[in-house]
Curated annotation (Swiss-Prot):
The keyword Signal does not apply. It is a multi-pass membrane protein. GO terms for biological process: pyridoxine transport; thiamine transport. Residues 210-248, 469-496 are annotated as: Disordered. Its main location: membrane. Residues 218-233 have a biased composition (Basic and acidic residues). Coiled coil: none annotated. The keyword Glycoprotein applies. The chain crosses the membrane at residues 8-28, 54-74, 82-102, 111-131, 145-165, 170-190, 283-303, 317-337, 343-363, 376-396, 406-426, 435-455. This is Thiamine transporter 2. Residues 29-53, 103-110, 166-169, 304-316, 364-375, 427-434 are extracellular. InterPro entries: Folate_carrier, MFS_trans_sf, ThTr-2. The gene is SLC19A3.
Length: 496
């Protein structure tokens, strides 16, 4: 049982390898692209209405209810127990998928899958407690890349087994169960961290900027920095008063430390969201992520509606693999694009939100399954491109701790929005719309997002132009004279 508490090695390489193996097998789930054909087929005999209006909404509700408690618990218990909990939830989910029957059982499946997605935060946060700051960027890149590779590999494997070997969907779920079981076993061998970002932080440690957190964050943003970056890092919460020394900190009751943590969280979030740039990028993140998750949750039902799996060959695995790969390429390519994001960022959000809306309208109006697949490819790739930019714009001037806070709150707000959409559009207690009409609503939703950010971008461009006109030197002045104030107001382009 020592594997729960100790590690055979303190090397960051050992930790990274174990974590990446866990990430690979937890995401290598070939059954996912064919979940709807499996549930609607002879194994489960569920109707489209039951899946859409009764079963799938449970995932959204459970994810929302579990997210905030899990975020707090993850830091308090120092990550590893939550990663193990995720592995257990994976196993329960697929055992119920394989051997459970009926709507109620599938609702329980969705609850445990909500637990899986809520505990996913531990996988990404774990590395910052066991890996030294100079390795943050590299390890973060490994952990994120391996999940994309695993999901793509699982989708390709599923398509090959279904199309060439005519394998039953049931056995795809058996393979997924075996994969997540391997992930659970490897989670037991992760080293137990001695510290965490907040509740078990070391007051004296140096805080690295989040430019070393994400592999796309390579340079410091040269525009206006939000005020929150100038404040004391959240990891120093127990000593924020300036009067608590180490000995006094150890004598504090846990309840008092917890109160200090929550108070500091509130102050940090208030300061961070006071930055207009961070606020608007976070606003797009929340609304777009809510819509994106909703599409992922219901797109297979739309495909089955356009081309029933019992009557025709389906290529869900190939489409998911292509979409994931295309999104990864788009996210990688944006790191080499020089754009003045301060000036044109909101315009980019508006333009690509129009693209998202158009792709969803295409998926609604077309009767051709291949056009529907194409719309999904465009939608997923453009979202992954934009979310990469949004992560950079939000995180570039924040400490690791404050980025984690903003990320958690943005995700929670996205879930609140998604829950509202689900209750109104999907749930049988709401409008209970058929799946095709739902995608018309989702397309309109992204069109509204595009309109909001188009107006915002035009305001920024007009304000910047007016400011430059006011600051322009008079014609009679010496053109060789330098103007420090003009240089300080120039907005530099940023290379991601």
């Amino acid at each position: 049982m020592d594997c729960y508490r100790t590690s055979p090695s303190n090397s960051w390489i050992y930790t990274t390898v174990i974590l990446c193996i866990f990430g690979f097998f937890s995401m290598m789930r070939p059954s996912e692209p064919f979940l709807i054909p499996y549930l609607s087929g002879p194994d489960k005999n569920l109707t489209s209405e039951e899946m859409t209006n009764e079963i799938f909404p449970v995932w959204t509700y459970s994810y929302l209810v579990l997210l905030l408690p899990v975020l707090v618990l993850t830091d308090y218990v120092r990550y590893k127990p939550v990663i193990i909990l995720q592995g257990i939830s994976f196993i329960i989910t697929w055992l119920l998928l394989l051997f459970g029957q009926g709507v109620k059982t599938m609702q329980v499946v969705e609850f445990f899958y909500g637990m899986v997605t809520a505990t996913e935060v531990a996988y990404y946060a774990y590395i910052y407690s066991v890996v030294s700051p100079e390795h943050y960027q590299r390890v973060s890149g490994y952990c994120r890349s391996v999940t994309l590779v695993a999901y793509t590999a699982g989708s390709v494997l599923a398509q090959l087994l279904v199309s060439l070997a005519n394998l039953s969907y049931f056995y795809l779920n058996v393979i997924s169960l075996a994969s997540v079981s391997v992930a659970f076993l490897f989670s037991l061998f992760l080293p137990m961290p001695k510290k965490s970002m907040f509740f078990h932080a070391k007051p004296s440690r140096e805080i690295k900027k989040s430019s070393s957190v994400n592999p796309v964050l390579e340079e410091t943003h040269e525009g206006e920095a939000p005020d929150c970056e100038k404040q004391k890092p959240t990891s120093e919460i127990p000593s924020t008063s300036g009067k608590l020394h180490k000995g006094q900190l150890n004598s504090l009751k846990p309840r008092n430390v917890t109160v200090e943590v929550f108070v500091q969280w509130f102050q940090d979030l208030k300061e961070c969201y006071s930055s207009k740039r961070l606020f608007y990028w976070s606003l797009w993140w929340a609304f777009a992520t809510a819509g994106f998750n909703q599409i992922l949750n219901y797109v297979q039902i739309l495909w089955d509606y356009k081309s029933p799996s019992q009557d025709s060959s389906i290529y869900n695995g190939a489409v998911e693999a292509t979409a994931t790969f295309g999104g990864a390429v788009a996210a990688f390519a944006v790191g080499y694009v020089k754009v003045n994001w301060d000036l044109l960022g909101e315009l980019a959000l508006a333009v690509f939100s129009v693209v998202n809306a158009g792709s969803l309208f295409l998926m609604h109006y077309t009767a051709n399954i291949w056009a529907c697949y194409a719309g999904y490819l465009i939608f997923k790739s453009s979202y992954m491109l934009l979310i990469t930019i949004a992560v950079f714009q939000i995180a570039v001037n924040l400490s690791v701790e404050r980025y984690a806070l903003v990320f958690g709150i943005n995700t929670f707000i996205a879930l609140v929005i998604q829950t509202i959409i689900t209750v109104i559009v999907v749930d049988q207690r709401g409008l209970n719309l058929p799946i095709s009409i739902q995608f018309l609503v989702y397309g309109s939703y992204f069109a509204v997002i595009a309109g909001i950010f188009l107006m915002r971008s035009m305001y920024i461009i007009y304000s910047t132009k007016s400011q430059k006109d006011v600051q322009s030197p008079a014609p009679s002045e010496n053109p060789d004279m330098s103007h420090p104030e003009e240089e300080s107001n120039a907005i530099m382009s940023t290379k991601l």
